[in-house]
Design a protein with these regions (language model features):
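Short His-centered aromatic/hydrophobic patch
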Residues: 93-101, 117
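Carbohydrate-associated surface elements
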Residues: 149, 171
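Short hydrophobic beta-strand element within catalytic cores of glycosyltransferases
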Residues: 42-43, 294-297, 307
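A conserved, positively charged/aromatic
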Residues: 74, 113-142, 159
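A short helix/loop element that forms part of the nucleotide-sugar donor recognition site in Leloir-type
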Residues: 175-188, 194, 245
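A conserved mid-protein helix/loop that constitutes part of the nucleotide-sugar donor-binding site
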Residues: 19-30, 193, 197-219, 228, ...
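Conserved acidic donor-binding segment of nucleotide-sugar-dependent glycosyltransferases
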Residues: 309-310, 314-321, 330-336
Length: 373
């Protein structure tokens, strides 16, 4: 095996779309390469193609797999062949499907296996998934959760002591954006309040709750010109557009689809909103913290581990439009509060949630995994 700085790490992703875990994988891969690791991305070859294209744009050579059914022996054997050819030292699987497949491949290749879970939706109410994940984790060199809240859930599901699951919070490399183009594109004046949310359009992200809060907020004439812009795509788009039309919000709700210019969106925003029903440690929240935005977020999952209410953000119960509307109103009417919370959030992000801090943690995990192999 290679020395620690020259290890070959296979990063396995079950999804190839533009979402938080996939963006995290790109930053993890880039930073590992900067530190002397060889990185082998392993990603779906029959999806939308965003993630393999992004890896290629960064001069990686991704390996593609095609999974035609939940248990696909041809896919499994293909992964074994590919990773044997690439001579990887450690398999690092992200989320449920690749945790299970990665466990099988690692067992055949006799390589250490690291599992990172980014959320808990995979095993809720599905006993077969719980059994499969428990088996995969039982054979892993390390199991990682991105928050202490998820660690507790996993420990219960996997019947492991919490200490057996390491917590490594996500970290990012921040980027600075420019606000002018976004507001001009959306037809929003500099004096009109803009609330930005970032996340694909699925029920778990709570975007309907945000629109319900906007409707309540605009009943106050002081906030009648308020706009909401949501970056993301997904199955709820039709329902969100229908709600906006039904309640005369169409001119104030902007569904933007996938956006590569998240730093610009945040620069244009007065407030960042995270109305999710469930989260690990969302990258969008970290991006908003680095941007120094006034933040209101649901107090779910790992969010309270990242921001403290009234110190770096205003936290509210999930699925509670009146509470969310109240928090948004407080931030909109109090520029000093936005500035204070935003500055505190940025300082905390710089201390605790950088990509370097995250990669330091994974380097330690890899070293321990290789030492046990």
């Amino acid at each position: 095996m290679n020395q620690q700085s020259g290890l070959s790490i296979a990063l396995l992703s079950e999804s190839d779309g533009p979402a938080g875990a996939e963006k995290l994988l790109l930053q993890l891969a880039e930073t590992l390469r900067e530190r002397g690791y060889a990185v082998c991305p392993v990603v779906p070859g029959n999806g939308c193609g965003w993630l393999p294209a992004e890896f290629r744009r960064r001069a990686f050579t991704p390996e593609l797999f095609v999974m035609r059914r939940p248990v696909d022996w041809r896919c499994l054997l293909g992964l074994v062949h590919t990773l044997r050819r690439r001579r990887v030292d450690v398999l690092h699987s992200h989320d449920f499907t690749m945790a299970v497949y990665g466990a099988a491949v690692a067992g055949i290749l006799r390589r250490p296996h690291v599992i990172t879970m980014h959320g808990g939706r995979y095993f809720a109410g599905r006993w077969s998934r719980r059994v499969a994940l428990r088996a995969a984790a039982g054979h892993a060199a390390a199991a990682v959760a991105v928050s202490a809240a998820l660690q507790a859930d996993l420990a219960t599901v996997l019947r492991l002591p919490r200490a057996a699951i390491r917590v490594l919070h996500n970290g990012i490399r921040p980027a600075v954006g420019s606000p002018n183009g976004v507001r001009r594109e959306l037809g929003i004046g500099a004096e009109e309040p803009l609330i930005v949310a970032i996340g694909n359009l699925y029920p778990v992200k709570g975007h309907l709750v945000l629109l319900q809060a906007l409707r309540a907020l605009r009943e106050d004439p002081a906030f009648a010109r308020c706009h909401v812009a949501i970056a993301g795509r997904g199955e709820e788009e039709t329902a969100l557009r229908a709600y906006a039309a039904e309640h005369a919000l169409t001119q104030h709700v902007h569904l933007l689809g996938y956006r590569a210019d998240v730093p610009d969106l945040l620069a244009a925003a007065d407030i960042f909103a995270l109305p999710s029903r469930s989260e690990g440690v969302p990258l969008a929240l970290l991006e908003a913290m680095f941007a120094g935005k006034g933040i209101t977020a649901s107090a779910v999952g790992g969010v309270p581990e990242v921001v403290t209410s009234e110190r770096e953000a205003l936290l509210v119960p999930s699925e509670d439009p009146p509470s969310l509307a109240t928090a948004l109103g407080r931030l909109l009417e109090d520029a000093a509060l936005r500035l204070r919370l935003g500055d505190a959030a940025r300082r905390r992000a710089e201390r605790e949630f950088t990509v370097d801090t995250m990669v330091d943690g994974y380097m330690s995990v890899y070293a321990n995994a290789v030492g046990r192999a």
